[in-house]
Amino acid sequence: MAPTDQLQEVKIMLHGTAASEGIGIGKVMLIEEHSLEYTPRTVTDTEAESQRFKAAVDAFCYNTEKQAENLRSSAGEKEAEILAGHIQIIKDPYLSGEIEKLIADGQCAESALEHMCDMFIAMFSAADDELTKQRAADVRDIKSGVLGILLGVNEIKVSDAPKGTVLVARELTPSVTAGIVKKNIAGIITETGGTTSHSAILARALEIPAVLSVEGVASSLKNGDTVVVDGSEGAVIVNPDDNTVAEYSKKRDAFLAERKELENYRGRETKSASGEVYELFCNIGKPEDAVKAVDADGEGVGLFRTEFLFMDRTSIPTEDEQFEAYKKAALILKGKSLIIRTLDIGGDKDIPYLGLEKEENPFMGFRAIRYCLKNRELFKSQIKAILRASAFGDIKIMFPLITTMDELREGKKLVTECKADLRNMGINFNENIQVGVMVETASAAVIADMLAKEADFFSIGTNDLTGYTMACDRGNNDVSYLYSPLQPSVLRMIKRTIECGVQNGISVGMCGEAAANKLMIPLLISFGLTEFSVSAPSVLNVRKIISTWTKEEADKVTAKVLEMSTQQEIVEYLKSVV
């Protein structure tokens, strides 16, 4: 046996980002990118070349629509819309128009497409935040798809992968993922991507264990290698021995049994072991997602992200369009609580037609409530739409990124003005609609005692609160180690916010990822949180975790945690008791 063969048979542990929970054991199938090389050329018949480009785009859109339909049935509407977004990007008037101009100047369709796509990829890749960087991957996927059609290169297909396959790629694009036959794929490993990447989102939707950002994995593995994918811990074991396979087979079976057991918590009240009752809501981005909240057994919606209504279009949605969207969600929920967050534009969410200037640090700049208070007609249109929809369900209004009392008061003043306008028009709405604050900055947490006197409720956004408190971007690998809601400073911000809410008799919820974190839940119970708002797939698991804790036990654990001075110390302790 050659030395290299001996080396390859040694058990190796690789590490990456835990992107989709579960254990997968199977054989590697490398997803190798097709060569899309071509010789740039000058064209003289520019009209024919333009028609060639348009035909390729039409074929791409047709293929993408079919892929989206596959995803719609295997994963869901939200996941299918990732691919629908690809169609909107390639048909964007600016992108397609600039490509047409280059063709008119004599460039071949391949060169024109590649030039413009590479420009967009560079722009998105240079962004500070992870979500905008993700758009670079989308444009790469689009470029490959259209180039492949122009060059006559077949699509990469994984639909024929046999049962027990682990897909390994540098980057697993949405277009490739759409072809996955769920029952045949044991796991996914990629060199790129994080927890918010489309690879991760799709893997979670398909319930396939996934580990991403494993450096060099696509070049170090070969087809047929046996691997274990631990999507819960972010580990990949190459060439596992029999004992390792047996160990992880047990872990996989236990994980699947636990997932099945969670169905026993469907239809139950969300209650601690000592009898305290909590509200367990879902986070949604579109009215249709309210169906997922109901199907997941959520008790309402704790966060409706309205900015998605403004995206993937070329103009501001009208008041009537917004009203219909909010009304639709309210009717689906049939009287269950629906907390609608007003427009949170800026930061990682850019809407081109609004003409926001590029900022050096958009997360610290002109976004959310700051933008809305400077663009009052747009803001009032949204508030009126929410008020009108409140006649059809239990709707509440929530302002994002509040940092001062003035912002809350100005926002409430506009609500009062909008109520008067609707009253004068004879339009029904809930006169007593609640107006709350999303606590996601250190400033809001520090003045939570004052905000609680004028807000009807709080919802803690731990994702931004953690980033702002720790002054770090979780998408930046150099500082991502700081990003954790279990940092002592962040825990104290959360504790203070909840205590201020309780002391002033208002409800306090949490809609960040921490609300579903099993290490955080006993602390949140002890702090006095009353509402948990999580992703739909997390509902039953959170209900189960809450049911295992008494308030007394949670208080004891929390008291010890608050004596600790480092995140590492806190995490190690919580892992030993949770």
Feature locations, PLM:
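Conserved alpha/beta-domain cores
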Residues: 259-578
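Non-catalytic, soluble scaffold/interaction modules
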Residues: 1-332, 338-345, 375, 382-383, ...
